[in-house]
Amino acid sequence: MTDDDRIKLEPSWKAALRGEFDQPYMHQLREFLRGEYAAGKEIYPPGPLIFNALNSTPLDQVKVVILGQDPYHGPGQAHGLCFSVQPGVATPPSLVNIYKELQRDLNIPIPSHGYLQSWAEQGVLLLNTTMTVERANAASHAKKGWELFTDRIIQVVSEQCPNVVFLLWGAHAQSKQKLIDGTKHLVLKSVHPSPLSAYRGFIGCGHFSRANSFLEQRGLGPIDWALPPL
């Protein structure tokens, strides 16, 4: 049995990424994570949720991709979807700004929570390019191998899915544009929604309405960006 046979991954992703789990970088990443757990470090998100973005949004259902950097590093926040937090956790500042733009762009009331699972289940792949982090230690798992894996995920979406909208917010996300076939897909770029930059172009970008217009023009259902109450 190879390592990828033991990974709990949604079938379409497991088929598309078969072989990645036997690459040298993945063996190194696995050993790094084993060492972190063995040292008693608290790693987020919890193990069963590390691949939540993939398990919530099958490859053949991807309509929109939003890229984040690494998971939230506070207790109880991260659950494997970028920008999203678990129910009962305060909405982080960047997500508040995303909500402000949704309100401006589509007149959607600002939700009382930060749980984006309904977006994922509609085809929004909420992908952090680094998929784990140590508690209270931002970017602690950067450059350990995750970026190679998530680059491959972006490439697979670009190659195998038609008519996807990629929302690239900030320099880190925009560095991934080279992995995307811009002749097949819509790539929308803006500054990051963080409080440091949101009012330098994110607020006013219109990405959510533009994404839905693109999808509807191609006979695909729009995303309902309004979140259900918890």
From Swiss-Prot:
It catalyses: Hydrolyzes single-stranded DNA or mismatched double-stranded DNA and polynucleotides, releasing free uracil. GO terms for cellular component: cytoplasm. Keywords: Cytoplasm, DNA damage, DNA repair, Hydrolase. Excises uracil residues from the DNA which can arise as a result of misincorporation of dUMP residues by DNA polymerase or due to deamination of cytosine. Gene3D superfamilies: Uracil-DNA glycosylase-like domain. It comes from Pseudomonas putida (strain ATCC 47054 / DSM 6125 / CFBP 8728 / NCIMB 11950 / KT2440). The active site is at residue 70. This is Uracil-DNA glycosylase. Its EC number is 3.2.2.27. The lineage of its organism: Bacteria, Pseudomonadati, Pseudomonadota, Gammaproteobacteria, Pseudomonadales.
